[in-house]
Regions:
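Internal helix-turn-beta structural module
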Residues: 408-436
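A short core secondary-structure module
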Residues: 204, 208-258
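N-terminal glycine-rich flavin-associated loop
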Residues: 81, 142-162, 188-191
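A structural signal for short hydrophobic beta-strand segments in well-ordered beta-sheet cores
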Residues: 196-198
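Glycine-rich beta->alpha junctions and the first turn(s) of the following alpha-helix
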Residues: 2, 57-71, 136, 256-361, ...
Length: 451
C-alpha cells in the first residue's frame, strides 16, 4: 500500500494491482485525532488486508528502476526459494548449487563491484533492496550475497590493483565463492586477542591456529583470513588479512586441503551455508595473497567494511521481519475460529500485524538512510549501527509475534514461522552484537554532543 496525501485527501494505492482507493479528509483527520486507538488500528489492519496481495506496504521511496530490480528478485525468490526454504532448513541442507548459479546469473555476487572489475556497479541502496528480497525468502540466500560483499569491500578498499583484477571478476561472476575466517574460540568480539599465526617462510606464509563460526567455510574457494603476523605487536596492530585460496569441499570431504581440518557446528537457525570450526596446521598462503601486500593492516582493513556489512545485515533483518509479517498475516487471514471468523478479525491479532508493519517501515527507512549516506561517501557508522540494531530487534519482535498469532501451531516445526523465529535470533548476535552496536552508538553520540 502506498499512502500519500494529495490535496486534502488520503490516498491508498496498491502499486502492483493498480487498486486506487480514496477517503476524505474527515476519516483521515479522525485517525489523527483519535491517536493510537483500537478502532484506528483496526482501520489500518483492514487497509493492510485489502492490499495484502501486493506484498508491498507503505511507500519505501524506490524509483522506477529500483522497483523493477526489486520485482525481478522477488520473482526469483517466489519461484526458487520460498517453496524450498523450509525443507532446506528442516533437513539442514546446503543451498543447492543450482540456486547459487541462478543467483550468479542475476548478478547477486557482483551488485556493488565496479563495472571495470566485472560487477554491476550498483549502489549500496540497491544492494539493500535486493538483500531484503533475498532474505525474505530465506536468510541463507540473503547471506550468500554477504560473503561476496565482505570480500569485495576488503579488496576495493585495501587490495592492490593486481589483487582486484584477479579476484573481483571471479567473485562477481560467482566462479569463486568467498568466506570470512575471522572469529577465534574464546575471543568473542575482541579481534585484538586473536592468536592464529601467519609466519613468513620464503614465498609463503604458514598459517597455524584455530578459527570458529566460519559461514560457508567448506564450500568456499577463497578465505578472507585474519591472522597475526607480528607476535610482538599486541592487540590489533599485529594482525594481517590474507586472500587464502582453498579447494571447494562438501559434506563428505569438508576440507580437502593439506593443513586444514575442521567440522560442522550444528545451529538453531541461519542454515543453508552451514557453520564450521577450522584448524590450521601448516597451511600455506602465497605472499602475494597478503591483502594490500603490507603486514599489520588487517584490523584497519576490516574496519573499512563494517559500515557496509552492518547496513547489509540490517537489510537481511528486514527480509526476515517481512517474511514473519507476511507469514503471520496469511495465517491470521486463513485460520478460522470456532465461530467461522478469521483470526485476523480479532483486534489483538490485527493490532500485532499493524505494529509489525509499522516497525518494519521504520527500520527500513533508517536502513535506507544509512545506505544513502554510505553511497554519498559520508561517515555512517552511527547510522549503520542504529539500523542494524533496530532492524534486528524488529525481526525478532515480528517473528515472536508471528509465533504468537499461530498459537500452538507456531511451536510446531512443520510451520515456517518456527524457522523464521530461529533465523531471527542470530541477527542480534552476528556482524556486531546488539551490545557492540549500542557501544558504537553511545560513543558517537558522546563525541558529537560533548557535555
Amino acid at each position: 500500500i502506498k499512502q500519500c496525501l494529495v490535496g486534502s485527501e488520503m490516498c491508498i494505492r496498491d502499486r502492483k494491482n493498480g487498486l486506487f482507493q480514496e477517503t476524505g479528509t474527515e476519516e483521515f483527520n479522525d485517525l489523527i485525532l483519535n491517536g493510537n486507538s483500537t478502532a484506528d488500528r483496526m482501520k489500518l489492519a483492514q487497509l493492510l488486508k485489502d492490499g495484502f496481495s501486493s506484498k508491498n506496504f507503505g511507500n519505501s521511496g524506490l524509483d522506477e528502476t529500483t522497483s523493477i530490480i526489486q520485482e525481478q528478485f522477488r520473482k526469483f525468490v517466489e519461484d526458487d526459494v520460498t517453496p524450498n526454504a523450509h525443507e532446506w532448513h528442516l533437513k539442514d541442507n546446503l543451498i543447492p548449487m543450482s540456486v547459487i548459479e541462478k543467483m550468479s546469473e542475476l548478478g547477486v555476487f557482483g551488485l556493488t563491484i565496479p563495472e571495470e572489475y566485472g560487477g554491476l556497479g550498483m549502489t549500496r541502496f540497491v544492494d539493500c533492496v535486493v538483500t531484503e528480497e533475498l532474505a525474505r525468502g530465506y536468510i541463507g540466500i540473503g547471506s550468500l550475497g554477504t560473503r561476496g560483499d565482505i570480500a569485495a569491500e576488503l579488496l576495493i578498499t585495501g587490495g592492490t590493483e593486481e589483487q582486484k583484477n584477479k579476484y573481483l571478476p571471479k567473485i562477481a561472476s560467482g566462479e569463486m565463492l568467498p568466506c570470512a575466517v575471522l572469529t577465534e574460540p574464546h575471543s568473542g568480539s575482541d579481534m585484538g586477542s586473536f592468536k592464529t599465526r601467519a609466519v613468513a617462510n620464503g614465498e609463503h606464509y604458514t598459517i597455524t591456529g584455530n578459527k570458529t563460526w566460519v559461514t560457508h567455510g567448506a564450500r568456499s574457494d577463497v578465505m578472507m583470513l585474519l591472522a597475526r603476523t607480528n607476535p610482538d605487536e599486541k592487540g590489533y596492530k599485529g594482525l594481517s588479512m590474507f586472500l587464502a585460496e582453498k579447494q571447494r569441499g562438501d559434506d563428505d570431504n569438508m576440507f580437502p586441503d593439506e593443513g586444514i581440518s575442521g567440522g560442522e557446528i550444528e545451529v538453531l537457525g541461519y542454515r543453508g551455508m552451514k557453520e564450521y570450526e577450522m584448524a590450521f596446521d601448516g597451511f600455506k598462503v602465497k605472499k602475494e595473497n597478503l591483502l594490500g601486500e603490507k603486514e599489520g593492516n588487517g584490523f584497519k582493513q576490516m574496519m573499512e567494511t563494517f559500515e557496509a556489512a552492518r547496513i547489509q545485515t540490517a537489510a537481511r533483518a528486514l527480509g526476515v521481519a517481512q517474511s514473519a509479517f507476511e507469514t503471520a498475516m496469511q495465517y491470521a487471514i486463513d485460520r478460522l475460529d470456532t465461530n467461522g471468523g478469521s483470526l485476523y478479525d480479532k483486534p489483538r491479532n490485527a493490532s500485532k500485524i499493524v505494529s509489525m508493519a509499522t516497525e518494519i517501515m521504520a527500520a527500513r527507512q533508517l536502513t535506507y538512510y544509512a545506505a544513502r549516506e554510505k553511497d554519498k561517501g559520508h561517515r555512517c557508522d552511527l547510522e549503520a549501527g542504529m539500523a542494524k540494531m533496530l532492524a534486528a530487534r524488529v525481526a525478532w519482535a515480528c517473528a515472536d509475534n508471528g509465533v504468537q498469532i499461530h498459537g500452538g501451531n507456531g511451536f510446531a516445526l512443520e510451520y515456517p514461522i518456527s524457522r523464521i523465529l530461529c533465523d531471527s535470533r542470530i541477527l542480534n548476535i552476528f556482524e556486531g552484537t546488539a551490545e557492540i552496536q549500542a557501544d558504537i552508538v553511545t560513543r558517537r553520540l558522546v563525541s558529537t554532543n560533548p557535555a
